[in-house]
Each structure stands twice: as C-alpha cells, then as structure tokens.
C-alpha cells in the first residue's frame, strides 16, 4: 500500500481547489522519476521521455479544478504517460502498435518488506540478476506491480493486456526469482498476490 496516499490526495486537492504551485511542484517531484522511467520504456530516449512526462504535468496543471475528480492520481498519471509516449512514437516513427515485448525498463531496485524476510546482500544480488534476466514484458509487469504498487487489473488496463496475462507473467517472474534464491514459491506466502 502506498504510504504517501493521504499526502498525495491533499496535494491533489490543493492544486485543484487553490491552484497551489507548491503542491503541484511536490506532485511533480514525487511522481516524475517513476513516470520518466516508464516513458523511457516506450521511447528509449531520455530527452523524449522527459518531454512526455513534462507534457503530462502541463495537462495536469491545465486541468485545474477538474483535477479533484480523478480518484486514482497515480494510475491516471501512468495512463497519461503511456498515452503520451505512444503518441510521440506515432509522430516520431509512425509506429502504430508497440507490443509489450518491445518495452524496455531498467529496474532501479527490487523492494521487499524487511519485516517479511531478512535478505542478505548476496540474495539481493541474486534477485537483481534474476529480475534483469526476465523477458522485457515480464520485467515491466513485475516493476509496475512490485515497485509502483499498481494492481494487476490496473497493469492489464495500462498495457492493454488481459488480466490472465498479467497473472501468468507475475507467476513466471516470481518463479524465476524464487528459483534464483532457492526459494520454493509453492510452499510459502513470501510473495503475496496483489488484489484484483
């Protein structure tokens, strides 16, 4: 669960109701790194991904008072970023249909709750190697679920894939990671399935 949610909602309200520039800047700083990395997975250009995310935030500012009607700002921003990136691709390359296997993503970290499991530096290294060895689509789905804390259903909608595909890709990712660290995924609740 995103611990920043109440703060994000308050910032969203401040922007919507009072055009609060400071709140807008905080939202930008909070979401920009993840959105830029997500846009990069489509565009493969740092400059274009930065422009795409900037365009998304310009639209957020222009939305003004209607911003309060958005119930899940994080999902809205990821969806807007995806759409903006795909529009850039259409304009730049004439590429109409980008397949999820074409996505490229660099994971900044793999996060697991330390209360659930004590992981040594060697295990972290093994996990990182396992994640990096995942197919591109599988890696992107894993990142969106585990790092960005999106639900399976949200990832399915965001990537225009079936819910079953998301479930299968997460199962594949978790099996590969579990295998890399010598962990039997079937005999433990280490990896919890996100609620649909």
Each PLM stretch: what is its role?
Residues 5-9, 95-117:
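Internal acidic/polar
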Residues 129-132, 136, 140, 148-165:
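Helix-turn-helix DNA-binding module
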Residues 3-5, 158, 174-196:
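C-terminal edge and immediately downstream basic/flexible tail or linker adjoining helix-turn-helix-like DNA-binding
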Residues 1-33, 196:
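N-terminal module of bacterial RNA polymerase sigma factors
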Residues 37, 51-58, 71-83:
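Structural recognition of an alpha-helix C-terminal capping motif at a helix-to-coil junction
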Residues 28-46, 131:
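Amphipathic, Lys/Arg- and hydrophobic-enriched alpha-helical face
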Residues 79-99:
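Arg/Lys-rich amphipathic alpha helix in sigma70-family domain 2
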Residues 17, 57-72, 92-93:
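Sigma70-family region 2
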């Amino acid at each position: 669960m995103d611990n920043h949610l109440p703060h994000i909602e308050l910032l969203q309200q401040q922007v919507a109701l009072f055009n609060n520039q400071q709140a807008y800047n905080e939202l930008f700083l909070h979401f920009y790194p993840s959105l830029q990395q997500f846009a990069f997975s489509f565009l493969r250009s740092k400059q274009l991904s930065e422009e795409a995310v900037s365009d998304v935030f310009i639209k957020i500012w222009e939305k003004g008072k209607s911003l309060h009607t958005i119930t899940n700002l994080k999902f809205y921003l990821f969806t807007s970023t995806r759409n903006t990136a795909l529009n850039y691709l259409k304009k730049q390359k004439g590429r109409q249909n980008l397949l999820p296997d074409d996505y490229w993503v660099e994971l900044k970290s793999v996060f697991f709750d330390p209360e659930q499991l004590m992981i040594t530096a060697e295990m972290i290294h093994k996990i990182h190697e396992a994640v990096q060895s995942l197919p591109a689509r599988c890696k992107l789905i894993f990142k969106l679920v585990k790092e960005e804390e999106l639900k399976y259903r949200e990832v399915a909608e965001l990537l225009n894939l079936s819910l079953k595909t998301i479930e299968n890709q997460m199962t594949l990712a978790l099996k590969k990671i579990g295998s890399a660290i010598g962990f039997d995924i079937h005999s433990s609740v280490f990896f919890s399935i996100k609620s649909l």
